[in-house]
Amino acid sequence: MNSIKFPVLDRTTTNSVISTTLNDLSNWSRLSSLWPLLYGTSCCFIEFASLIGSRFDFDRYGLVPRSSPRQADLILTAGTVTMKMAPSLVRLYEQMPEPKYVIAMGACTITGGMFSTDSYSTVRGVDKLIPVDVYLPGCPPKPEAVIDAITKLRKKIAREIYKDRIRPQQGNRCFTTNHKFFVVRSPHTGNYDQELLYPPSSTSEISTETFFKYKSPVSSHELVN
């Protein structure tokens, strides 16, 4: 029998002690065990299914697909999202425990794609329903692109701090402390520019008395003069 030799334990302090923080340890454990909830409604999801095979082997990233949103921390949306499916998608996202992440895969998920042209039943962008962490364009994206999106998400998780995980509102999802983004006032305030509703002062104005003075049809030249 072949003898098994165990390596000699290095007793030096520099190689046997690891200094880290609880935040880094938590990030490392989460990025190494992402459990995705697969939400595929169209053809883009076929490309993700090829990752399950031995050629790409997405299990090496610790991805374990789950069928229940309560056990998942990543939802991967692929395909067209219709108005009828929108409530189901939002319900699945709300049932996922925090912290949770979203990858939008494909042009139809990101912008609505060709199905949103003159369509009243297609959602033009899944980010109108749930916050998105990584956008993956393509029609459809290649499996290598999906792996790249997962790698970028892992890097984002590795840089997170505790304050970034507290996201009570959907509007603050894109703001992270470590990225040093500036908080901009929401444009959807309802206070529209009233100047756009009126013609500029350089145009000719016709008084109400002049307009109602004429009972019979007259030319526009007479009204202006």
UniProtKB/Swiss-Prot annotation:
It is found in: Plastid, Chloroplast thylakoid membrane. It comes from Lepidium virginicum (Virginia pepperweed). GO terms for molecular function: 4 iron, 4 sulfur cluster binding; iron ion binding; NADH dehydrogenase (ubiquinone) activity; quinone binding. GO terms for cellular component: chloroplast thylakoid membrane; respiratory chain complex I. NDH shuttles electrons from NAD(P)H:plastoquinone, via FMN and iron-sulfur (Fe-S) centers, to quinones in the photosynthetic chain and possibly in a chloroplast respiratory chain. The immediate electron acceptor for the enzyme in this species is believed to be plastoquinone. Couples the redox reaction to proton translocation, and thus conserves the redox energy in a proton gradient. Keywords: 4Fe-4S, Chloroplast, Iron, Iron-sulfur, Membrane, Metal-binding, NAD, NADP, Plastid, Plastoquinone, Quinone, Thylakoid, Translocase, Transport. NCBIfam families: nuoB_fam, PRK06411.1. It is a peripheral membrane protein. The gene is ndhK. NDH is composed of at least 16 different subunits, 5 of which are encoded in the nucleus. Belongs to the complex I 20 kDa subunit family. GO terms for biological process: aerobic respiration; electron transport coupled proton transport; photosynthesis, light reaction. [4Fe-4S] cluster binds at C43, C44, C108, C139. It catalyses: a plastoquinone + NADH + (n+1) H(+)(in) = a plastoquinol + NAD(+) + n H(+)(out); a plastoquinone + NADPH + (n+1) H(+)(in) = a plastoquinol + NADP(+) + n H(+)(out). It comes from the Eukaryota. InterPro entries: NADH_UbQ_OxRdtase-like_20kDa, NADH_UQ_OxRdtase_20Kd_su. Binds 1 [4Fe-4S] cluster. Its EC number is 7.1.1.-. The lineage of its organism: Eukaryota, Viridiplantae, Streptophyta, Embryophyta, Tracheophyta. Pfam families: Oxidored_q6. Its cofactor is [4Fe-4S] cluster. This is NAD(P)H-quinone oxidoreductase subunit K, chloroplastic.
